[in-house]
From Swiss-Prot:
Residues 80-83 are annotated as: Involved in Mg(2+) ion dislocation from EF-Tu. Belongs to the EF-Ts family. The gene is tsf. InterPro entries: EF-Ts_dimer_sf, Transl_elong_EFTs/EF1B, Transl_elong_EFTs/EF1B_dimer, Transl_elong_Ts_CS, UBA-like_sf. It is found in: Cytoplasm. Associates with the EF-Tu.GDP complex and induces the exchange of GDP to GTP. It remains bound to the aminoacyl-tRNA.EF-Tu.GTP complex up to the GTP hydrolysis stage on the ribosome. It comes from Streptococcus pyogenes serotype M18 (strain MGAS8232). One of its GO terms (molecular function) is translation elongation factor activity. CDD domains: UBA_EF-Ts. Keywords: Cytoplasm, Elongation factor, Protein biosynthesis. HAMAP family: EF_Ts. The lineage of its organism: Bacteria, Bacillati, Bacillota, Bacilli, Lactobacillales. It holds the Pfam family EF_TS. GO terms for cellular component: cytoplasm. This is Elongation factor Ts.
Amino acid sequence: MAEITAKLVKELREKSGAGVMDAKKALVETDGDMDKAVELLREKGMAKAAKKADRVAAEGLTGVYVHGNVAAVVEVNAETDFVAKNAQFVELVNATAKVIAEGKPANNDEALALVMPSGETLAEAYVNATATIGEKISFRRFALIEKTDEQHLGAYQHNGGRIGVISVVEGGDDALAKQVSMHIAAMKPTVLSYTELDAQFIKDELAQLNHAIELDNESRAMVDKPALPFLKYGSKAQLSDDVITAAEADIKAELAAEGKPEKIWDKIIPGKMDRFMLDNTKVDQAYTLLAQVYIMDDSKTVEAYLDSVNAKAIAFARFEVGEGIEKKANDFESEVAATMAAALNN
């Protein structure tokens, strides 16, 4: 029987990422053979990972990485927020973003086949991480955007890495691109422009806005406050030339009824039309980057601000950890039973 020294245990831990006791047991079982011990731990890790495969991993981190003209944002999930702060987990997230930015895969399958600096594939790295960290660790998704040599990439993470954003801006500089990414992190746009919104989606969101106004009006009526008007439109996509012409005509009729002299109408109408556009593009303001009020200059929309500095937003991607993942809501009894079963099976 080979002597299992502290030096051997340390070496195996460094190679495998296993805990002290797991490393020592593996060396004992393989009579001190380092290669066999590594393989044994890998096999045990795969078995442990398989047992954890049906668990829901909704915590985690995003990772962002810029490689030349390419930027990547990734989401990696763990089961608990505690593990998401683990140094090994953070290193895995950052390495994932880097290898994806460099490899430019077309989909998750291609991403998982990429080779990490350690020599293992991304898929193998996640199996091993699940085994060594003790929770289900899963690679969920990624996005890539590319720029030309004349454009600028902005990469930004917020809330300790729970939100990750990448963006491309034409004109301006890298600092402007980062500011745009900061805006995206805070304001949660889902698309660049109203032209990307589905017509039915706009109608549904407008109905929700009017329902909220209806509820508000019920409260206002109880305290004798005037009712708020319902919205006829929610997006620029609904504002045809005929709608704009009719709005201008209504404003002119209003000014005439108020007795305002026609010679000053040209000074009043633009402001009222701006108000009309603001009131009738609420869906755009919620979901489209260009229509949102810019957090760095709240006197302008993002589009207006970028125009003022001869710049233009080209593309972006925003990930927030756990969005769209349905967490299991187990009762206390079920949770205890599941924990005991897991302990017996490990």
